[in-house]
Amino acid sequence: MPRFAANLSLLYTELPFLDRFEAAARDGFEAVEYLFPYAFDLAELLARLKANGLQQVLFNAPPGGTDAPGIDAAWAAGARGTASVPGREAEFRAGVELALRYADALDCPRIHCMAGLLSESAAGADQESAARSVYVSNLRWAATEAAKSGRTILIEPINPRDMPRFFLNRQDEAHAVVQEVGAPNLQVQMDLYHCQIVEGDVAMKLRQYLPTGRVGHLQIAGVPERHEPDVGELNCAYLFEVIDEVAAQCGWQGWVGCEYRPRMGAEPGGTSRGLGWRARAG
């Protein structure tokens, strides 16, 4: 069975954020991921991890802004990354530097740098070309900085239905960027939810990309409602078998992040009651 990490931004939302660590451990998770750590004291986050025997395996670099209030405000205003946005290179670098400080303190091996949104006012090939040039340059710099402390930078294709104008949508696009940058610590965060919506053929995509060594992290959710992975059109039990099979063949050892919205998530114990899919997968 794959190794599952609880996404604390979406799971256990009936609880205050810091209490979600204990809830995840109680349900048998050994690792966690979430969007952003910046609004919380580092010592408190580390204490929650240690007290509950959890590994921090992923979080995001800031979507915009350079301090906790600015980051929260940027996310609330719809910012979804600065990596591909011309003119915001200094903001991107400051955000990555902040993320690396948190990653070092939390011993987190992976940081997801969201690509950002294409402008509404400028469309077409010229804008995409400029965005890609900035994206590659920023990621090359970020990978170099992250390598100094043994961290990996991740990029994630996200479907345009949930996130219109997001710069990166397809797996092949992400892998092309990773190959162009050429840094061994730049990898793809492959979310099977987004992959199914944009491309489908998820099992074959897993067979194609996991053996490349360019996939650093997987995420799952049911399609189309983004509930538990066994709700909707994806056959999650089969996909878990594919992951196990391919991982055994190629040595892939990554985590599978549970980035979904539980159907009963707002109810006390709702996340826990929805975890039957995990037991069936084992």
Q: What is each residue range found by the language model?
A:
Residues 1-28, 38, 50-53, 101, ...:
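Histidine-acidic metal/acid-base catalytic patches
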Residues 65-84:
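Active-site gating loops and adjacent loop-to-helix segments of metal-dependent hydrolytic enzymes
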Residues 20, 34-37, 77-81, 88:
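Alpha/beta catalytic barrel-like cores
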Residues 80-187, 197:
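Active-site acidic/histidine proton-transfer and metal-coordination neighborhood
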Residues 10-12, 61-65:
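Short glycine-enriched loops at secondary-structure junctions
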Residues 33-55, 59-60, 115-122, 126-127, ...:
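Glycine-rich, proline-tolerant flexible connector loops at the mouths of alpha/beta enzymes
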Residues 33, 57-60, 112, 154, ...:
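Conserved beta-strand positions in the central sheet of alpha/beta enzyme cores
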Residues 16, 37, 41, 91-95, ...:
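Soluble or luminal CAZymes and related metallo-dependent hydrolases
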